[in-house]
Amino acid sequence: MSIRAPPRLLELARQRLLRDQALAISTMEELPRELFPTLFMEAFSRRRCETLKTMVQAWPFTRLPLGSLMKSPHLESLKSVLEGVDVLLTQEVRPRQSKLQVLDLRNVDENFCDIFSGATASFPEALSQKQTADNCPGTGRQQPFMVFIDLCLKNRTLDECLTHLLEWGKQRKGLLHVCCKELQVFGMPIHSIIEVLNMVELDCIQEVEVCCPWELSTLVKFAPYLGQMRNLRKLVLFNIRASACIPPDNKGQFIARFTSQFLKLDYFQNLSMHSVSFLEGHLDQLLRCLQASLEMVVMTDCLLSESDLKHLSWCPSIRQLKELDLRGVTLTHFSPEPLTGLLEQAVATLQTLDLEDCGIMDSQLSAILPVLSRCSQLSTFSFCGNLISMAALENLLRHTVGLSKLSLELYPAPLESYDTQGALCWGRFAELGAELMNTLRDLRQPKIIVFCTVPCPRCGIRASYDLEPSHCLC
């Protein structure tokens, strides 16, 4: 029978302080710093508001990662923390052990106490020192007190905690700086989004993700705020379309008002668009406004014309491109020259290439192989879902011999795997898959390689062949 070890003295002290809020407040300046993380977490979960307010004033670390405790936000607890910060901001002389410089409200997966684990809590101290030493991108200088938040707008109205925080920060401008680096929009009406943006330092925002279906006219209302995000690095757009009711002249004006904002974005590097249709025939307008070299271009399931692809291949901003993703962009009837030119521009830097489900045929593949074989940094190549014969696939594999950094390869099942009606012949697919694997192993030793069929019309899953065949779900 095992005997439970007696509680450590620190644990006994913590339990006593949680039971007696008055004692906790009166002894705060004398508490060992090792007690602060667990005591604060318990006080926050039990909503001991006066204890929270006092603990913030005496916090012995430079960073308070409150975001990890805000999974289920409580307004009164948040108010208590902010009231503690208010006291610090107005004090000429801080309490002896008080070191707080950063209130971090970002939604992270860290466990609050794990952040401070270790005998000396040296890890969070080092982390917080880095965060306070770095200049905020929106200010160009170090601030006396920083509040970090990420904005995720997914409800029709702002929740009360975020509303209170933004109003609180706005009223204390000059005493502290509220820094938001990431903005995500999932479903909030545009007038509410604009209300939020008017309370945020837009210079700080580095990443924007819009994950809700917008009309082009709505995007245009958002665009002027985008142009004020001078340090924006990444923009992700989903499901933006132009209504058929918009007259062509108005559509052109709307597109110009959106694309002209990129003239103000000197640090923009990552363009990601998914199911976006309004730029068909107008991509050149956006490309002409780019001010910096792009690292990533993602345009999946987008409507693009051949001239759009040509303009992309001519764009000087793609010469240092690391990722190109054109999944679901139909290239079947395009000349291979724009894609060849695009790869040529990025041949020295390209690391990820995704041409899945582009409808590429043998002749187009043959044209891009010479430049593809020179993409020496390529580590991920996805090409499944294209209409490629066995002979063309074997030729493709031979052209990958010099690509020593390839670690993930996804290829289509050969056309010969299907019958005349387009149905998969399972035995034939397995036979050809084994043959292709043997061909590749004679050339080099692959790391991860998979041959995939088109999606099953019934279950939507691709059958695959890597070391052995794998059926769909039917």
UniProtKB/Swiss-Prot annotation:
Q: Which domain of life is it from?
A: Eukaryota
**InterPro entries assigned to the protein according to its UniProt record, in alphabetical order:** LRR_dom_sf, PRAME, PRAME_domain
Q: Name one GO biological process term.
A: negative regulation of DNA-templated transcription
Q: Which GO terms describe its cellular component?
A: Cul2-RING ubiquitin ligase complex; cytoplasm
GO MF terms here are:
ubiquitin-like ligase-substrate adaptor activity
Q: Kindly state which keywords UniProt assigns to this record, in alphabetical order.
A: Leucine-rich repeat, Repeat
The segments carrying the LRR repeats are 97-122, 177-201, 202-228, 229-264, 265-290, 291-322, 323-341, 347-374, 375-399
UniProt lists the family membership as follows: Belongs to the PRAME family.
Put simply, this protein is called PRAME family member 7
Gene this chain is encoded by: PRAMEF7
